[in-house]
UniProtKB/Swiss-Prot annotation:
Gene that encodes the chain: ATG7
Name the UniProt record assigns to this protein: Ubiquitin-like modifier-activating enzyme ATG7
Similarity comment text for this entry: Belongs to the ATG7 family.
Function field: E1-like activating enzyme involved in the 2 ubiquitin-like systems required for cytoplasm to vacuole transport (Cvt) and autophagy. Activates ATG12 for its conjugation with ATG5 and ATG8 for its conjugation with phosphatidylethanolamine. Both systems are needed for the ATG8 association to Cvt vesicles and autophagosomes membranes. Autophagy is essential for maintenance of amino acid levels and protein synthesis under nitrogen starvation.
SUPFAM superfamilies: Activating enzymes of the ubiquitin-like proteins
UniProt main location, coarse: cytoplasm
Active-site feature positions: 498 (glycyl thioester intermediate)
């Protein structure tokens, strides 16, 4: 055979599963963030029957080193450079990038020739549109001064012996056969004039080695300058292995030799160009929606609030009592913060006046249960939302108990819901509706957030907790009252029956209520965090009172009142001991609540003090003429 220049085929062809890009998205958001430094990738060599080269497959496990722990497969370790901007991807000097990676492989190969095999991926991930652009390179290099020519090609005798050796030594790409036909690992000192070189070959083209042979032969020649002719066995897993007799020219003896490089993968049209993929149409839309919804939240952790705990928010089970204007806006804000479990409770139905003020309803919902319609709307907005609507009459203090059996069922259902959830939002229309949930929320040690509206004012507050510091416990919605709540719903005119308020007030109160809730979750003390402490989001106020007539917001703090009708120690302890029996009487008779809490005694003392202060002097002689 005449002497000829050796031709090479591509060593690998890459294949990417959609799970790879899904995992890249997750890691970019949660781990890599703004970093565009190299991240390790792991892949296995898979023989191909139809392609001219072996395959490297990439999936969601390719970021995990355990994915190549299989002793029966040949693995390759590489890296991915994911750019933060598409401009970074486009402006990258691809030739220099490949040159740098080739030098890395060259230097690694000088220490261990088996490490001269690698791959590298450059990419840009558009996480909003779920589109990805990427390009893979397999660094092939050859010494500029080295010429490799072939003088003969023959079949390999007893090839099974060499195949078995490579199958038993999966991490080895190059080995040596000595004069006694014994196979051993390659080292620059182990080769002599009677030795032959064995190379694991991933090419499928007849008598054509993969381009990785250039890497190995360049390193071999650099370490064995005196060798000018060599017999190389290219060992494949099928029956197409072959032997080549090669001539290696002299090379420049340089400390840092120059390399000729290649290796960017061609696209399906045979052109050197990156590939792109749009996963928005290929994977489960619900999965895309779930990751997309979390996108803005996870971006907070990149720069602005790296220590914020988003998982603790997502895991909350929130009970919203009242599915009106406040309930609708609070639900939307909670959903935006990543809460996935919401239960809405209301006893009303949607009226034609509701949809313009209550964003979870529309014209066609008229007459439907508010709670159920709101929950259905949340699921339409985001199908992965676990939203439930419960139509329920919350027992109200000061209202006549007309049907004890029904009211007891309502009480038991409310108690069940409170036990099942972590946080309660009190967003009902009347004060007396909030009394029982306030009491039960304290007993069950839940986070309770309260929001209430006036015409041009609002109140947002977090309730203190019975189980907290007795001396510094924060007050609840009823701690400023000197009487127990009574029936405020009977005998009202139309303007009193409807929530008459400036439309923007509800949005302001709702958003603040949710922000207070999120801030509480950032501290392990939850209910018991004081107003003097700060979380990663800043302060956690007790009360916020806003006034739109002069556009001011007051940040207030009031301690728990020892005689509070809802959260005082006597009320909580009696409720714990007697349960429904006490509550049944308390709902019908607010004066009982005043007696138990001590409010009645306080009122008596105030009246006695007032009587003494205004005790008129009846003795005319003691009158002073003015």
């Amino acid at each position: 055979m005449n002497e000829s220049t050796v031709k090479y085929s591509t060593a690998f062809r890459s294949f990417f599963d959609t799970s790879f890009f899904q995992e890249l998205s997750r890691l970019k958001l949660e781990v890599f963030k703004l970093s565009s430094e190299a991240q390790k990738l792991y892949s296995k060599v898979e023989p191909s029957k139809s392609s001219e080269s072996s395959h490297l497959f990439f999936n969601g496990n390719s970021f995990n080193p355990d994915s190549i722990s299989d002793a029966n497969s040949t693995s390759v370790i590489g890296s991915i450079f994911n750019f933060n901007k598409i401009e970074g991807f486009k402006d990258l000097d691809k030739h220099q990038f490949l040159q740098d990676r080739a030098i890395e492989s060259w230097e690694a190969g000088l220490d261990d020739i088996n490490k001269a095999v690698s791959f590298h991926v450059i990419s840009f991930a558009d996480l909003k549109k779920y589109k990805f652009i990427y390009w893979v390179c397999f660094p092939y290099f050859q010494l500029e001064s080295l010429e490799i020519s072939c003088t003969n090609v023959t079949e390999i005798e007893n090839c099974a012996k060499y195949q078995d050796w490579f199958n038993n030594n999966r991490s080895q790409w190059v080995s040596i056969v000595d004069s006694n036909c014994e196979i051993g690992s390659y080292s620059k000192n182990a080769f002599n004039k009677n030795s032959k070189l064995l190379i694991r070959d991933t090419s499928k083209m007849k008598n054509t080695p993969s381009a990785l042979a250039k890497n190995f032969l360049s390193i071999f020649k650099y370490q064995n300058l005196e060798v000018k002719e060599i017999s190389v066995y290219f060992v494949r897993e099928d029956d197409s292995s072959f032997q080549m007799s090669l001539k290696l020219s002299s090379i420049d003896n340089e400390v840092t030799p120059k390399l000729k490089t290649s290796g960017w993968e061609k696209n399906l049209l045979g052109r050197l160009a990156p590939l792109s993929i749009d996963l928005s149409t290929l994977i489960d839309p619900l999965k895309v929606a779930g990751q997309s919804v979390d996108l803005n939240l996870k971006l907070m952790k990149w720069r602005i609030a790296p220590d914020i705990d988003l998982d603790v928010i997502k895991e909350r089970k929130v009970l919203i009592l009242g599915a009106g204007t406040l309930g609708c806006y609070v639900s939307r804000s909670l959903m935006a913060w990543g809460v996935r479990k919401l239960t809405l409770v209301d006893n009303g139905t949607v009226s034609f006046s509701n949809p313009v003020r209550q964003p979870l309803f529309e014209f066609n919902d008229e007459g439907k249960s508010k709670a159920e319609a709101a929950a259905a709307s949340l699921k339409r907005i985001f199908p992965l939302m676990d939203a439930t609507g419960v139509t329920l009459n919350i027992p109200m203090i000061g209202h006549v108990v007309s049907n004890e059996e029904n009211i007891k069922k309502d009480y038991e259902k409310l108690l069940e819901l409170i036990k099942e959830h972590d946080t309660i939002f009190l967003l009902m229309d009347s004060r007396e509706t909030r009394w029982l949930p306030t009491v039960l929320g304290n007993i069950e040690n839940k986070i309770v957030i309260n929001a209430a509206l006036g015409f041009d004012s609002y109140l947002v507050m977090r309730h203190g907790n019975y189980y907290g510091n007795a001396e510094k416990r924060l007050g609840c919605y009823f701690c400023n009252d000197v009487v127990a709540p009574t029936d405020s719903l009977s005998d009202r005119t139309l303007d009193q029956m409807c929530t008459v308020t400036r439309p923007g007030v509800a949005l302001m109160a709702s958003s603040l209520a949710v922000e207070v809730f999120v801030s509480i979750l950032q501290d392990e003390k939850r209910n018991n965090i004081s107003t003097e402490e700060k979380t990663v989001l800043g302060e956690v106020p007790h009360q916020l009172r806003g006034f739109l007539n002069n556009f001011t917001t007051l940040k207030l703090e009031t301690p728990a009142y020892e005689h509070c009708s809802a959260c005082s120690k006597p009320i909580i302890e009696v409720c714990q001991e007697q349960g429904w029996e006490f509550l049944k009487q308390a709902l019908a008779d607010p004066l009982l609540v005043e007696r138990v809490s001590g409010l009645e005694k306080v009122k008596q003392e105030v009246e006695e003090l007032a009587a003494k202060s205004f005790d008129w002097v009846s003795d005319d002689e003691e009158l002073v003429e003015l």
